[in-house]
Amino acid sequence: MNDPRIIVALDFPDSTSALDLVARLDPSLCRLKVGKELFTAAGPQLVEKMMGKGFEIFLDLKFHDIPTTVANACRTAAALGVWMMNVHALGGRRMLAAAREAVPPGSVRLIAVTLLTSMDQSDLDEVGLKGEPQDVVQRLAALTRDCGLDGVVCSPLETSRLRNAIGADFCLVTPGIRPADSSPDEQRRISTPRQAIENGADYLVIGRPITQATEPAVMLSRLNKDIEDIRDVSRFDNF
């Protein structure tokens, strides 16, 4: 598989647990996501170790700070050699533009988080964001595109609308992916792999259904098979 579409979320508290799981996966069949918990515990050394095993890494630290600080953080992350990194679109235009300037196009894929998949309408109302979740996501995605970033992280429930509004040359990364027979956990705006791809997602972030499976490699193969079954009838291969 030349361009694995599944990104396995390594939501572990330490490097030992993460590496135990990674040893059971094939780098040709998935990429790996390292988030705040694992990166805080294990640092860049773990990222380098996993890249040494052939895995491409999505560094999911959601940088959100003043423009100079975010630019410096992005530059440092890019120097690690990661495949993808993200910032938070709510940081605004100047922050997004500074991140793009620090990480030139064609080097690391630079994307932005729109809304966390744990947020629903009541959360938006409480923090004062106007509009329904899909409206807020579309505004933030348009801002991200205008600043020259490569794509956004968004709920699979927003992918179809974003794909139609923004077009094919914009990467949509979707967390909140669960097989039809699994628990939704704390995420509220979720979807199955098939639904997400049919709606226009490019990459699927999947954590517990794989990492907590009795046979993670078997579950990964099953999910990849689900994806392959619909690729020929989807715009999926055109990205």
UniProtKB/Swiss-Prot annotation:
The protein's matches in SMART domains, at most eight in alphabetical order, are given as:
OMPdecase (SM00934)
InterPro entries in the record: Aldolase_TIM, OMPdecase, OMPdecase_AS, OMPdecase_bac, OMPdeCOase_dom, RibuloseP-bd_barrel
GO biological process entries: 'de novo' pyrimidine nucleobase biosynthetic process; 'de novo' UMP biosynthetic process
Report the top EC class in one word. Answer: lyase
Reaction it catalyzes: orotidine 5'-phosphate + H(+) = UMP + CO2
Listed under GO cellular component are: cytosol
Q: SUPFAM superfamilies, per this entry? A: Ribulose-phoshate binding barrel
**Per its record, what are the GO molecular function terms?**
orotidine-5'-phosphate decarboxylase activity
Q: Provide the residue positions that the database annotates as binding substrate.
A: 11, 33, 60-69, 117, 178, 187, 207-208
- EC number of the protein: 4.1.1.23
Described function: Catalyzes the decarboxylation of orotidine 5'-monophosphate (OMP) to uridine 5'-monophosphate (UMP).
Which family is annotated? Belongs to the OMP decarboxylase family. Type 1 subfamily.
Q: What does the record note on quaternary structure? A: Homodimer.
Q: What is this protein's name?
A: Orotidine 5'-phosphate decarboxylase
